[in-house]
UniProtKB/Swiss-Prot annotation:
It catalyses: L-tyrosyl-[protein] + ATP = O-phospho-L-tyrosyl-[protein] + ADP + H(+). It comes from Xiphophorus hellerii (Green swordtail). This is Tyrosine-protein kinase Fyn. Transmembrane segments: none annotated. A lipid is attached at residue 2 (N-myristoyl glycine). GO terms for molecular function: ATP binding; metal ion binding; non-membrane spanning protein tyrosine kinase activity. The gene is fyn. Residues 82-143 form the SH3 domain. The modification Phosphothreonine is found at residue 12. The keyword Kinase applies.
Amino acid sequence: MGCVQCKDKEATKLTDDRDASISQGAGYRYGADPTPQHYPSFGVTAIPNYNNFHAPVGQGVTVFGGVNTSSHTGTLRTRGGTGVTLFVALYDYEARTEDDLSFRKGERFQILNSTEGDWWDARSLTTGGSGYIPSNYVAPVDSIQAEDWYFGKLGRKDAERQLLSTGNPRGTYLIRESETTKGAFSLSIRDWDDEKGDHVKHYKIRKLDSGGYYITTRAQFDTLQQLVQHYSDRAAGLCCRLVVPCHKGMPRLADLSVKTKDVWEIPRESLQLIKRLGNGQFGEVWMGTWNGTTKVAVKTLKPGTMSPESFLEEAQIMKKLRHDKLVQLYAVVSEEPIYIVTEYMSKGSLLDFLKDGEGRALKLPNLVDMAAQVAAGMAYIERMNYIHRDLRSANILVGDNLVCKIADFGLARLIEDNEYTARQGAKFPIKWTAPEAALYGRFTIKSDVWSFGILLTELVTKGRVPYPGMNNREVLEQVERGYRMPCPQDCPASLHELMLQCWKKDPEERPTFEYLQAFLEDYFTATEPQYQPGDNL
């Protein structure tokens, strides 16, 4: 089974030098592609290794979120003798413009130019076609990134969310980078028993100094692939054998296309509004398509809502905010009526989802998990020194599998309507706003924390308006006098205590979103071990 005792000295090794930052990724070296000679060169002569970005040919650099290409994994030799790393498609992709390339999972590519960041100029070695491809849809041939079971930088909580999605059987699994141990991995498996029902168990995969991998020292392997094969054949002490890799959803693209990456103000006629999803004080939200190919959400703002110049300036910042729990801004039409084009979320706003949708049947564990997702997105906004200013369930969007994402961050600052800018006018969300922000305009990340506490009440009451029976003026007066909402029905006291922490009078005494995320993610698991003991296997 490829045990380390009989391993070849030249076996692939995992590098120890790993950067902990989000941008760097795994930092692996790969063995050679066993079949490079089968691919035609299409008459290419002396193509330099563009996978090295701007580095001189022959110097290995880190690409693809940490892939080190210095070993020329799966290399194609051109007539000039230069090796070019081959990449393989992880998903199907349909071209959105005439500049990009449609492809199917399993197709192999030669990368011609990777200087565009999220979009690479590539040639398919399957079809011979050329065009731009999204870089997060491919991985180096024969790398662990190319394995269906490898999920990379995925946190424990997100691993559990994915594994516990509807339709995954017992034995569904994935491997991810360990959050706690540099150079190690985690194996996460969906399990079931009479006491817990469906749940996830985590096993730490450790790395030997000699380059192998093990969960228990009694079974050691040259590669992660061999480890997976071993535990697919037999449980061998795990909760169950590995049955099927967890389904990977399509990765989100940061842009509509390579053309909108930098010039992302688009013509209004490129958008088709198909179905109205909602109607608010300042405009409407539509499901639509861009370029006749790509489903998007379009927020249309009533003329006069905000200055087009101010909006465009703020949108430049919003476009750079990228996180799994933030709705991605794709493009804008900045002439009035302003259009804001974002990723489409299938279940609409969290408020509508809780009041009238599937959310009515959700139990506390799901509601707390949704709160944890919002806290994770806000923790990112906190790290980026940004402020939301209008955090409430109406501005949280819901997708498949109860995924929650934050929308409309930063827009509230730009609204010019007098009924809003007065801060105590009819259109201003007094009941969600911290007193120092409502009274004195002091909006900070700590006033967002106050709003998050109000959002928690919306979750546990399935969308009930905060401070029932009180109007805006009464709320402002009572809160200033120290009134706080009592514990909602069926809400645990510990969760209400968290709300009260968010509503501290002194903003600096309120918790950080980093703390709120950790508290909520561990709300039901704080007494359980994070990892199963490997040496007991």
